[in-house]
Design a protein with these regions (language model features):
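Non-catalytic interaction-recognition regions
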Residues: 2-118, 125-616
């Protein structure tokens, strides 16, 4: 599928390089990246706007083109003069531009020619599947997401970052990146010891001992009933033989069984959410048992970024946060995170020789790089905002600036139903599980709705709205548009005997109607065609900024425009998609509907959502 925006951008680059050469102006590669080619909101000004003259005017300050409008006019005239040289599908003479004008601010405004829009629609109809541009060139990405501590079922609060990470991984794979979807198993910290104690308390209950709810509260144990089946497994394996053992004795006996069961529970929850990782990385086995933490710290030590010393005062006394647990009057091993903009240096090895979370993360970053990753992507909650600078410094140092860290911060989601907060689960103990929400609204709705807001924006997820069949329910609205497209094409197939699954017949249909824009003169039809032509730009912007929510927004806009056209046809018979006694305009509209159907299906595939052919 042709991306008209990137095609035009390359044309602007070609022309400005010629102009710069003629005026002895040097342009850097960064200069040629800084300008935009994007849709115009106010359609009376055209279809596409370019700000290249505005971004480069300073470079031309000592030339005869030292005024932004003069420079814009020079660029525009070159574009028009040479547009027949723009190569599309290895061919020239595609006249892309119908009209070009200059706004006072220096924007170059372009109205697209019907011919190029015809080509875009025909191309979508004729290909078996829309092919995305290769933006990644097989660059390796480690995308670690949905990695809560393996101490219970997936919390509903984890769903936003988990879905964001999974959809982003799909998108990056589709544009040519080599993405490893990884789950980091936090199985080496204090929380695992708490888990083992919690399971043992349930095991004691299974053995007939009276363990009250207050016992769980008193000793800070996990109170959820989800631990009972694991406790019963222990009883099957050990009978009551564990009861008289100390922690040091029973921990090694039950650890693997308990952790493995918890991971299987989490995998099942994630699978219900539509998520399946490529790799499950154990902190204990891969970092602690293989001595990777000391290896990573030694690398930082050689860069003079590790030293033994004291934190001057507890951080809480400085008002920096609640991290005063890192303070100790004794010497500790510290990372010089202040060199990378952090508030204070951070502890990696405590006075008692135990590692901090940061120490594990340092070793994990080294492991990612050693396994070939060049970009590390980590969706995290906003409460991890302070972690960004220190970890970014770690990655730059460990990889000698050969790898890039991208931490995506996701805001909290408040789940409500009928304007009331969702009640906590007895099974989970003190939180709402993701499985409960999935069972109520379905994974498709949850996956799509989670990306109907930008990831750094808090929002209320209303379960009662998600099951409504109305335009207020985004996934229903998009699926309904796809189902309506299927309905139109099914009716056309029955009436006109058109086989929409036959590539040859589709090519013939497009060939006959290559100038169908001449037949479609309703403003809504024209705008829908232009919006379809914007699809690959939306994909590229979503990849560039790691923002898959842009695709959700785009699909909603497409659906809204299509439903508006449908309603026009209900009011005006001349605007129906199928007019039996006007085969030309019917074929033209069928091409439009078929192209729209493909774009919606292609967009939903990124979310791992199957498009609906009919609404039930």
């Amino acid at each position: 599928m042709l991306n008209i925006f990137s095609t035009l951008k390359q044309s602007f680059i070609n022309e400005i390089q010629v102009i710069a050469s003629q005026h002895n102006v040097e342009l850097t590669s960064q200069d040629l990246k800084n300008f935009t080619v994007e849709p115009i909101k106010d359609k009376k000004n055209g279809d596409i706007a370019c700000n290249i003259a505005m971004t480069l005017i300073k470079k031309f300050s000592n030339t005869s083109l030292n005024n932004v409008e003069l420079l814009a006019n020079e660029i525009a005239s070159k574009i028009i003069q040479n547009q027949d040289q723009i190569i599309i599908d290895n061919q020239k003479n595609y006249l892309i531009i119908k009209q070009i004008s200059i706004a006072k601010a220096g924007f170059i405004n372009i109205s697209l020619s019907p011919k190029i829009l015809n080509k875009i629609i025909a191309e979508i109809v004729c290909v078996e599947k829309i092919i995305f541009p290769n933006l990644g060139n097989s660059l390796k990405i480690n995308l670690e997401y949905a990695s809560p501590n393996p101490t219970g079922p997936i919390h509903v609060g984890h769903t936003r970052g988990s879905i964001y990470g999974d959809v982003l991984a799909n998108l990056l794979k589709m544009v040519g990146f080599d993405v490893l979807k990884e789950y980091y198993i936090n199985d080496a910290g204090e929380q695992i010891l708490t888990l083992l104690r919690s399971v043992f308390a349930r095991y004691q209950q299974v053995c007939g001992l009276e363990i009250t709810d207050n016992y769980f509260v008193k000793f800070g144990l996990y109170p959820g009933e989800y631990l009972i089946p694991i406790a019963k497994k222990l009883f099957v394996s050990f009978s009551d033989k564990l009861l008289n053992l100390s922690e040091d004795q029973y921990f090694p006996l039950i650890r693997n069984l308990v952790v493995e069961d918890m991971i299987e529970m989490i995998k099942a929850d994630l699978f219900a959410l539509g998520i399946k990782h490529d790799s499950y990385f154990s902190e204990k086995k891969e970092l602690h048992d293989k001595n990777k933490i000391h290896e990573a710290i030694e690398i930082l030590k050689k860069q003079d970024l590790i030293y033994v010393g004291k934190l001057s005062v507890p951080m809480s006394d400085k008002g920096v946060g609640k991290s005063s647990e890192e303070y100790d009057e004794l010497d500790q091993t510290l990372f010089r995170s202040t060199k990378f903009g952090d508030d204070i240096d951070r502890v990696v090895i405590k006075a008692d020789s135990t590692f901090t979370y940061l120490a594990g993360d340092i070793a994990y970053a080294l492991s990612k790089f050693q396994r070939g990753a060049k970009i590390f992507i980590m969706p995290l909650g906003y409460d991890h905002a302070g972690y960004v600078k220190r970890l970014d410094g770690v990655v730059k140092t460990l990889t000698n600036n050969q790898a890039e860290l991208k931490i995506i911060l996701c805001q909290m989601v408040k789940f409500v139903k009928d304007n009331k907060p969702l009640k906590m689960s007895k099974r989970a103990g003190n939180f709402i599980t993701a499985r409960e929400v999935i069972d109520e609204v379905g994974s498709d709705a949850l996956r799509f709705l989670m990306l109907c807001r930008k990831n750094d924006t808090p929002f209320d997820f209303d379960l009662s709205k998600v099951v409504e069949q109305s335009k207020d329910n985004p996934i229903f609205y998009v699926q309904y548009a796809h189902a309506r497209c299927c309905s139109v094409l099914k009716n056309a197939q029955e009436i006109f005997k058109i086989n929409f699954s036959d590539p040859v017949e589709l090519k013939n249909l497009c060939k006959k109607n290559i100038d169908f824009l001449d037949k479609l003169n309703d403003e809504g039809e024209i705008e829908l065609i232009k919006k379809i032509a914007n699809f690959l730009r939306v994909i590229e912007m979503s990849v560039q900024y790691f923002e898959p929510h842009r695709i959700a927004f785009y699909l909603q806009e497409l659906a809204s425009d299509f439903h508006a056209l449908w309603n026009k046809g209900s009011e005006n018979p001349h605007l129906k998609f199928i007019i039996k006694d006007n085969i030309d305009i019917t074929n033209a509209r069928l091409c439009l509907v078929f192209a729209l159907k493909k774009v919606i299906a292609s967009g939903l595939e990124i979310f791992s959502i199957k498009p609906s052919e009919e609404m039930k």
